[in-house]
Amino acid sequence: MDGPHFDPTEYGTDKAEYWTDYEREIGHLFGGHADVLELGVQDGFSLALWSDCFVSGAVCGVDLNPLPDPPGRARAYQGFQQDPEILDRVARENAPNGFDLIIDDASHLGQYTAASFAYLWSQHLKPGGTYIIDDWSCAYWPGWPDGHKYTGDLSPLSVPPASGAARPPGLAETVRRRVRAVARPARVALTAHPRLQQAARAGYLRADRLTGTRRFPGHDWGTAGIVKRLVDLTAASSITGPRGGHPGNALPVHPITRTVVTPSQVFIHKARVPGQGSRT
């Protein structure tokens, strides 16, 4: 963090629970100018915090419930987070050139979170801006409207089955090992013909493609599913590249340059330059 320090506990907002993540990702903006939009503001405590974090710029909030007396220079609007009409109005009246920072702390429901992101990212978030989704992990709560009990394995991906006993390789694994052993590039002399070296590398990789594990299903309920879609969007430059095979016109004009996922939040950073993809 390069900017001034703020203590969110003084404002009564739950942002205090993960303020260090905010400081790491957007702290360099504190003390300067920023146009801010927050979806879901309840009593408006976070609007007071943003008003102090940024010395100038619009501070706006949208909530289903009215906020008759917003703090400081903040302005509050009543409406649904996914309603383009209210979102357009807020932007038109406060940040016609776009917002530098948008925080979604509203419904925490996948359908509405996705709708808000899709519209605001393309229409009202400035190039170089940051979009934040708070409390996405409620998708793992069975009691949440679109949540669901997690049924997967919580052990690290590299850890073998819990039994700890070495399992004999099956037919597919046996074939894979033998093909890789023959095609291992290190077994092909560096002085061999380039085409032979290329064939060895291709065979080595093909052995995994044909017999190895290629899919790793995960929890895709609610906002957790949205976060995983965002991971796909972060790799848009690879998806639309020559090896990805997806039409290049599918790449957003201002794609994602970086996505940071924490247990509570997702920070999505937007490219400053059109066509600038993620660093993959």
Go through each PLM region and give its residues:
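A short alpha-helical cap/connector motif
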Residues: M1-I103, S107-I132, S137-T280
